[in-house]
From Swiss-Prot:
Protein name per its UniProtKB record: Minor outer capsid protein P9
Superkingdom, natural source: Viruses
InterPro entries membership: Phyto_Pns9_10
Disulfide bridge map: none
GO cellular component, one term: viral outer capsid
Free-text function comment from the UniProt entry: Minor outer capsid protein.
Length: 351
């Protein structure tokens, strides 16, 4: 593959960031989605740098919301091969320094190159470990690995569920996540900081709400499915998440939009959420607060935890792989009537 020149490398990461900035929930379900096609193209050309690019997109404020929507889509899709989008292509890393190129790309896009969410150290390691593991374990060889794709689908769903649950726990303290925001004391800097905090808070609350909503919807749809891999995945979610009672949220959640409304089980009521002190504020309120306290020094940020950026990743997967009876081709035959095809699975040979 060889090393990429900076211009080409920046173009690849530019495409990933821009796609996640504009990513909409449900892109994965659309046939011929431009967003999915773009991410697939980037993945095919960045080799082993793919998990590092995804890691940076996870923690940068500009792409965080879109990346998490992408992960939620993969976690709740009926397309059994969609998890391969997390796998890397090839066995080479064409980047000399992914983080440096990512920084250059941010500057090229007019984004701040230090706006990275400050996650607790435990989640930082877990996120790195997860993405590195999926880079290897989410690969599927069309010649030898397709026959047990249904079992791989269940294993990957279980791994993603653990990642989402770790994120859910780590994101309870949004004030800590925004600890990287440190205004210099000027009115403009304080205003910019407050607006960014409001944006991040709103997005994190939305992601938390989407995670529980879409997982609940998946369980409702597939817990009694005739297809065993869907039943197993739904059972795994049921065991990992207290869906019936509503996964306890430490923060208030924003109203959902029409395409993101909660789906509850018959007879079960959705958890009631009231507005509290952590509810995102509108811009007018922020302006008033800044005017009233522009001379106040910025709050101190506690140390001890670090961002996920730059932390060495573990190369272990939390789920083992195993073979299963050959049922994939029969499954494709059954689903062909529903316009189910390999192209829509996201399957691609490892090269």
């Amino acid at each position: 593959m060889g090393k990429l020149q900076d211009g080409i490398a920046i173009k690849r990461i530019n495409d990933a960031i821009t796609t996640f900035k504009n990513y909409k929930l449900g892109e994965l379900e659309q046939g011929g989605s431009m967003a999915i096609n773009t991410l697939s193209n980037v993945r095919a050309h960045v080799g082993l740098a793919w998990p590092a690019i995804l890691r940076n997109c996870l923690i940068h404020t500009s792409s965080h919301l879109g990346f998490m929507k992408f992960m939620i889509d993969i976690a709740t899709t009926w397309k059994v091969g969609a998890f391969t989008l997390l796998g890397s292509v090839g066995d080479e890393d064409p980047f000399t320094d992914v983080d440096l190129i990512y920084t250059k790309t941010c500057l090229h896009l007019g984004l701040k190159d230090n706006d990275f969410l400050q996650f607790p150290e435990e989640f930082a390691y877990e996120a790195n470990s997860f993405l590195e593991a999926q880079s290897m374990n989410a690969r599927v060889d069309m010649l030898t690995g397709v026959h047990n794709i249904e079992d791989k689908y269940v294993f990957r769903i279980e791994s993603i569920s653990k990642f989402l649950k770790a994120y859910y726990t780590a994101s309870e303290d949004v004030a800590y996540l925004t600890g990287f925001i440190k205004p210099d004391g000027s009115k403009e800097s304080i205003l910019s900081a407050e607006l960014l905090k409001a944006q991040v808070t709103s997005e994190v609350l939305r992601v938390r709400n989407l995670i529980t909503t879409k997982i609940q919807q998946y369980i409702n749809l597939y817990e009694d499915s005739q297809l065993p891999h869907f039943r197993r995945a739904a059972l795994s979610y049921t065991q990992d998440w207290d869906v019936d009672g509503g996964v306890p949220a430490a923060l208030p959640q924003p109203d959902t939009t029409d395409d993101e409304s909660p789906v509850t089980k018959p007879g079960a009521s959705a958890p009631t959420v009231s507005k509290g002190a952590d509810q995102p504020e509108d811009e007018e309120i922020i302006h008033k607060k800044v005017d009233a306290s522009k001379d106040a020094p910025p709050k101190a940020v506690s140390s001890g935890n670090v961002s996920a950026r730059g932390i060495p990743a573990f190369l272990e997967d939390d789920m083992s792989e195993m073979d299963a009876p050959d049922g994939f081709h029969d499954y494709l035959t059954r689903e062909h009537e529903n316009n189910f095809d390999l192209a829509q699975l996201g399957l691609a040979p490892s090269v």
